[in-house]
């Protein structure tokens, strides 16, 4: 749900953002964003809508390193753009919102050319490298911050696990990978980011029409959310793709999956860790998380003996029973042989070194619904496990 694209392999911040867009991995690295200014503290509950989507590709809101908004030079507002103002009028009718209010918000939104550059695919292929990507997130600073977060909110995490069946380690892993437990939530104005991508999505992108329509839908959801909350729509800040709060929810995800988990009558993913924890758990439940099922198992594959083409063809979608999986030459041991469900062979490339492999379950696939990337999913899982070990669990 996130859409802050993490930089996977270094280089300059700007280049890193473009590269991570290509690999499709979703996260804000520790050094990539300045601390977020005070966010709106009151968010009214919104009705459910169709599921949120995340920007990116398989392997993936890749995310992408989050650049400094202060380095972005905005152009004039969209008030002078007839196409944007026409869209505002249509949106007001479509969403039953005050037309003058919608026109005012869109008119004050500013185009950010930097964002247009950041969503373009990398100009040349870069080798995916799980070991390098992993090292950005499974590291002492993030593990210590995760242990502190878990310690402070262990009652809420336990409550979420009981209510939704999602382990604390997965919730902690998500929030840790997305925003370093709220330390880096992004500092772009959400209206600027979404308007830029809704009205000026770069046509050089191979999926420009689809992506532009997606962001116009996100702008719809954001305007509805902001208007119902009573907060200043111009005050919301987040990633350059429009993701918000500790869990980096896109507006449609906020509309559909965010919950008031602290019981104060409002949903606040910026300032309420309880709401963030409950919302992440609710998201996974909605995407068919199965309580008690592991996310993956160790697997051994042997070149020349394992039918790699068949096993890798479905990508990360669990497709094979244990019997079918092992009949194709993939070796499982112990509990994996008793797994009651489907499996996928997950390949994690390591640059020029040999790839790593795991047998992903339906719960591994559920993690990729938060961000469509096997690399992202493994980072979330392993960060959560590392924090749990630090906690002595």
Segments predicted by a language model, with ranges:
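An acidic, Gly/Ser/Thr/Pro-rich helix-cap/linker signature
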Residues: 36-152, 158-161
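Glycine- and acidic
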Residues: 69-73, 261-265, 362-366
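Acidic helix-start/capping segments at beta-turn-to-alpha-helix junctions
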Residues: 98-126, 175-179, 189-196, 298-306
